[in-house]
């Protein structure tokens, strides 16, 4: 089994693990009605996503920084395009926040099982705080809002030369 502390190399260098996660993803796609047969999953790599969760544990992130169990509510690792993601995709983060807000889900239980509208989880690159408000209406769970913030890094800097007679 997995601990939830795995980093990219732990999963991505293991062909057996990758095949297992792909099998889970393919069968999930059929159950969700996204495809009719598991053989079609290879043509639909972007969805669904597969993630696994665990109760909080202290771990070292991919940068080597120690993430303390006391600072997170649970651990999450997510697959994207057939590999363990280096951090956490926005769509997966919102899904994790939503699942944490619904009592009795695996995510909610991994986070301690309490009523909550926010959760801080550890992922391979560090931590992320997300939230959701879910209510039970007529026997069905409904999500009233989902909350996520992201940090950004500079991807590129440069100059653009425009002739002065352009304006």
Question: Which residues fall in each region the model found?
Answer:
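Active-site proximal loop and beta-alpha junction motif in alpha/beta enzyme cores
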Residues: 1-167
């Amino acid at each position: 089994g997995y601990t939830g502390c795995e980093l990219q190399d732990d999963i991505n260098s293991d062909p057996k693990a990758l095949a297992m996660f792909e099998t889970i993803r393919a069968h999930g796609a059929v159950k969700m009605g996204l495809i009719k047969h598991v053989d079609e999953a290879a043509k639909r790599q972007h969805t669904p996503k597969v993630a696994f969760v665990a109760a909080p544990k202290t771990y070292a992130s991919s940068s080597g920084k120690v993430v303390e169990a006391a600072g997170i509510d649970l651990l999450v690792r997510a697959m994207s395009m057939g590999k363990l993601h280096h951090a956490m995709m926005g769509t997966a983060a919102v899904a994790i926040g939503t699942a944490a807000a619904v009592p009795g889900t695996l995510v909610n239980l991994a986070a301690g099982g309490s009523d909550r509208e926010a959760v801080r989880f550890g992922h391979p690159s560090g931590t992320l705080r997300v939230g959701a408000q879910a209510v039970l209406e007529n026997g069905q769970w409904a999500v009233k809002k989902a909350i996520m913030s992201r940090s950004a890094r500079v991807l590129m800097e440069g100059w653009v030369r425009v002739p002065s007679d352009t304006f």
